[in-house]
């Protein structure tokens, strides 16, 4: 950065940086004292933003009068015009034209400015007290400053307490959503990811992005991901539509079903359509059910999705906070219209009704009566059982797809639909929903231009996970594996260090990706090696090669929210849990300081802390050591000490109505094992043979007790439950 001489005519002082755009040109100043070197003054580029006292948004005034006027016009409109049209797109154009005209007439889109007001509990006297404190700080009067600082803290807590009991406490029974929002505001726990500063450090190709250009840059990148994918062959889709016959009766949607679907839309969620908001659809469900029902039935009958349902507003959701790279730190979530969600819900029901007969038994994602916990139990049971033999070498491959949903090839997906013999109406509708989708990115109320996508299935829609589940359904291996939508885990068990079964599985994965036009993220794909023999050289096990890249071998890996380690202990996972909940003590402490009702704080503790400590506990509870179990119990003990400072732990449990965490985990394990014993459960096949003793006694086992050589296997979920006679 230094370009001027710093000693005589020579440049002897250097400053190196890879972020030169953030610094001004160094200023060369005279030397200090007797030094022969000039002083190099380097300053960062500081852009002073003029604080904006308001923000501008565009919204419609959907009050009672405007909604009533809209309803009256819709009731009197002759919808027979729409019913007599035989083209789905023409029906949609007429429907949206009528709705737009009526809504614009009674609730026009207006520009509204919102002032950045103070917090609702702040008063003028409190603001004056803050000014006096700041003046004392600037004057250097330490004693006066500390006195005013303490006074500010006391007054602030008092104002918050009064505000809670006068304005917030009553919302608990009236509007729990607003109650929870005010609770987070009072405790200072609002999500920082929702602020306007979330994307200030984003870079694309190493270049910082101007905030005004951010939506357009994001949209260009999201669309560029699909640049190398071939678009859908329209000839095949037209041939499929030409073979459409009469739609089956079970595909016909009733007006009452549409009415119920509209009534169950979430009014608190946004919609891509600024005319038909979810609030308007819910309020006018009885009026709009008939025309929307006709539109959905025509769409299914013709296998065509109207263009209005294929437009999405993309909201970039950070994977990390704050996000730094556009290429890897953002996830595009598509927000579609409310009517599109209703239509998707009916088609997804038809999809699942057919596909449930073909879905892979090792697929646990987005499938009825299956969850992440079931996938984790299947994998952990296999690992603990295999590790009981000291000669077994266990290798686990954790697969990560690169841009999994964005790279779905529509031509490949169409072939999968046909291969699984889906009804042609479902195929045509699903492919039409993906064909020539249009999206725009919205950031801070700034929208990019609309662009058309050639591939991918939108995240955030109801049909997106189903499409990917169909795509990956034929990905199978000759060894054990489990899938949760795009998270795939492969397990190899062998006694020979030279065994190549996992490498064969990796080669099979590469071939599948080549055939289905998918990509593996080899940087995030990991391998774990588990072995408990006395003499073992890890170097004897050849490294795994995937797409000509060597896969990194790790000691720990977080799979579906649970950390597995190479020694099959739960220490790393317990440390992860304790670290995660430690960040949330502050919320409990702040609410207790404000004098919030103890029962309310207990509810908040159960929601934000206890739920974390109990996630997938059926997998790891039985393998905890006494120390680990006590460490987890200490979290609840600490929270109850904050909420009930004058009570012992036992008395606090009694007053709050809570159980010990170890007792709750034990009950969860017992209930999970009872569910698995149902014959139609997805994990019923992991149970050992059922015993038929000649004499039934209190101490007999329902299942054959696994013979465990190690305490590790004896404390696994399955062996533990059988030994406990659950």
What is the predicted function of each stretch?
Residues 1-20, 73-86, 178, 422, ...:
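Metal-dependent phosphoesterases centered on the DNase I-like endonuclease/exonuclease/phosphatase
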